[in-house]
């Protein structure tokens, strides 16, 4: 995604990797 986060759960149309 636009934020380019980096944890374990891949979500969103951009495939952001975020903690969830």
From Swiss-Prot:
The UniProt record lists the keyword rRNA-binding: no
Region (Disordered) location: 1-20
UniProt GO MF annotations: carbohydrate binding
Keyword tags: Lectin
Top-level division of the source organism's lineage: Eukaryota
Family: Belongs to the jacalin lectin family.
Protein name: Agglutinin beta-3 chain
Organism: Maclura pomifera
């Amino acid at each position: 995604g636009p934020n380019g986060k980096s944890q374990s759960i891949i979500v969103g149309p951009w495939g952001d990797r975020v903690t969830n």
